[in-house]
Amino acid sequence: MIRFIPSTVRQIGNLKNNCEELNNKFALKNEETSVQIELFLDKKTWVNLDDVLTLPWEGLVENLRFEIESVVDCKLYFEGDVLDDDKIYKKDVILNKRSSYLPKGYSNLWLEMKSDTEGIHNVTIKIFKSEGSDDEELIFQKTLKLEVSSIEIPEKNIFYLDLWQHLSSLARVYDVEYYSDEHFRIIENFMKPLADAGQKVCDLIVSDYSWAGQECFKIYDNQSSLYEYNLIKPYIKNGKLQLDFSALDRFIEICQNLGMCEEINLFGIIGNWNRGNFSVILEDFDEPIKVRVHNLDSSKFTFIRTKKMYEEYVRQIFEHLVEKDLWNITRVMADQPRNVGEVSEGEDLIRKIRDDVKIKYAIMHGDFFENYDGDTENFSIILNEYIRVQNGGLKMSDKSNFQNMTWYVCWTPFNLNQFVKSSLIESRLVGYMTYLFDMKGFLRWNYCLYPDSNDYRYRPDRWACGDMFFVYPGKSGVPELSLRFKQLSYGNMDYSFLRYCESKLGRCTVLGLVKEFTGEIADLSYNEQTREISGSYKDDYNLMESIKKKLALKLKK
């Protein structure tokens, strides 16, 4: 009736999973770990995951209730389907609901486990059946053995996760007022799992329509507004520009309280999209920056239109962050400049305001990286360009240092990515690849950006399903995590464990085991025509599990 299977398997529809059964699972002490439970039903059935006997509309129908018997902390979840670009339903959502009809056939459930006690513990799944007002009967039970090591998972997740936050999208999807109390309640709900996953960066949108709404005005299928709106409220009073920072400060405080504010990134000041299609309105400045201002003197809204006023606007932002003692962790973010010259005007302007400003780039175009001779701390480079550097096809500045950088993927490449169509092992591999590259972390442009409809297949010619988000908008403003996000989170903690092992055993010992899973950097190559990465990394759950167990045993000696 059930079997335990690896957490890295993605179910297609209600088909049986093509994988081996698990009887045992290894985990570090205090490590959250997971398996999936493959359930077979011979008919559509109402299923409860809690003690409460919830009923469908039909009333006291035949139902199943799951119960977990273990000294281990456990929680069981339903998994939900998402329609992928190939029009095939695939499991990706870890659902918050506690009861549901499950269809005839196979359904995967998600089981999370965590223990602070060393030893081999039984995790027994019991299934009870009842109908009408009859007493329950135990119809099936199965036990997984969880081996918990005496070695503890590192308390601090040092992985430098840098997922971009789209706060305006949350207001749209829940239809609440932008930057209202209700909006901030939802924002905090969504930031909590992000912080738990190792997020270190607080993103501040400080102009209007950054990224030009991802050029959503060009998309006529699944029409959606994807614009971001300024966290700051600029206004003119008695002829002077003034800024209301209340929403910005409130978001910073949320991030600080959650422990995800080691760095602040300012978006929308330079390197902003899009000159060609979303117009330049500043009279003597070539960046397509738009800052909407409420002129209280005339009771009208306008935009900043002169370089002088824009300079004053940026100066006040910088001064505010200095006053809040946040300047030393602040960086001005520019997204994918094609070359150094494209952002030189913006750099000159902000350096004129403060010469100690730190600028950060997400590098997609090799020409920029080859000609940039500044500090690259916390920069991020797309995977295919990193491979070019390693293969000698792209030079990097002498000041460049990959150890203080992150890497990223986006709509490209097609593999080693985190789409719904991607193998889940590719999300887990992020932590291991980051260790292989000897980098500090990983950046991605997505976390919670959604189309206006419930059809998540937006711009499939450009963005594969899942490219825009890692979590789903659940009811009551609470996110539902994806299988992809869970694997990414686990991989981040694996990275922290690998770094801990390195401090005790040496990098050579740890890297030798990691390479069995990731392969060598020299084996990686990128095909520009197919947008695919070739390499010797393995989609092998058992191999991945064995690395952690071997390292834990070495630490015991």
Predicted regions and their residues:
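Surface-exposed binding patches on compact interaction domains or structured appendages
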Residues: 2-15, 43-110
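Extended acidic/polar, glycine-enriched regions
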Residues: 38, 44-47, 96-156, 184
